[in-house]
Amino acid sequence: MTAQDIVKSFAFISLERAELLIKYNDLVMEKNKVMNLTGIKDLQESMIKNIYDSLTVYDKKYFPEQGRILDLGTGAGFPGVVLAILRPDMQVVLMDAIRKKLSFIQEAVELLCLRNVEVVHSRAEDAAIQPVYRDAFDVVTARAVKSLPVISEWALPFVKKGGFFAAMKGPGAETELGESQSILHCMHASVDAVKELTLPSGEQRAILYIKKNGVTPTRFPRKAGEAERHPIK
C-alpha cells in the first residue's frame, strides 16, 4: 500500500487532510534520524503503525463539533496531531512529560499551519488538578500509555461528565479491562464500546471507549507515581 492508499482507506479523510497526514509522517521520520521520536524507522511502516493506527481511534460519535481533545502522553504526536489534522474545528491539547518531543511537535504544527493545537509540558497528575484542564475535555486519548488501571486514573479526571476516554490498546486489552473495574467504579466511569481491529501489517488493536458518568472524586489522581506503584484493581 502506498501512503496515499493508507490514508484514503478511511472514507472520512479529504485529499487536503491526507496530504497533511503524509507530510506529518515525513517530518516525524526525518526528525527521527537525529532524535528518538519513535522506534519505527521506515517511512512506510510509520504510515501504518503511526498514522493509520492513530486514525483508527476516530469515530464521529465521540468527537463532537467544536469540542476539545486531550492527547495524554502524546509522544511524537500520535494520535493527537493526526486528530488535529483530521478535525480542524476541534481544539487539541498535546500533553507529555518529555519536553524535547513537544518541541518537535510545536515546530511541526507551525510548518503544517495547524491553528488548533496547544502543547503542554506536564505530568498528568500535576495538570489534572488545574482547573483549566480538569473536567474540561470532550474526549481524552492515550495510545500505548501504561496499563489501563494506571492510565484510567490519569486520564479520566480530564474528561467532562458525559465525555469519553479512548484508550488505544494492543493484544491483552480485555485482560486490562478486567483489571480496571475498581478504578472505573471509583471514577464513575463505564465502558461504552470496545472496537477491535487489525492493522494492514497484521497487528491486533483494541480501542476502549470509556464514558465518564459523574464528577471525578477530588482525591484522584493521586500524587505523582502513586498510580504506577499502587494501581487500583
Task: State each model region's role.
Residues 87, 159-161:
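Helix-to-beta-strand junctions that scaffold the AdoMet/dcAdoMet cofactor pocket
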Residues 41, 121-123, 193-195:
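Short loop/edge segments at beta-strand edges and connector loops
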Residues 162-172:
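Conserved beta-strand signature within the Rossmann-like core of class I S-adenosyl-L-methionine
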Residues 125, 147, 170-174, 198:
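Short "lid" loop at the C-terminus of a central beta-strand within the Rossmann-like core
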Residues 55-146, 152:
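Conserved SAM/SAH cofactor-binding pocket of Class I
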Residues 1-70, 100-117, 225:
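Class I SAM-dependent transferase core
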Residues 178-233:
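SAM/dcSAM-binding transferase cores
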Residues 101-103, 173, 177:
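Short alpha-helix immediately C-terminal to the canonical SAM-binding loop
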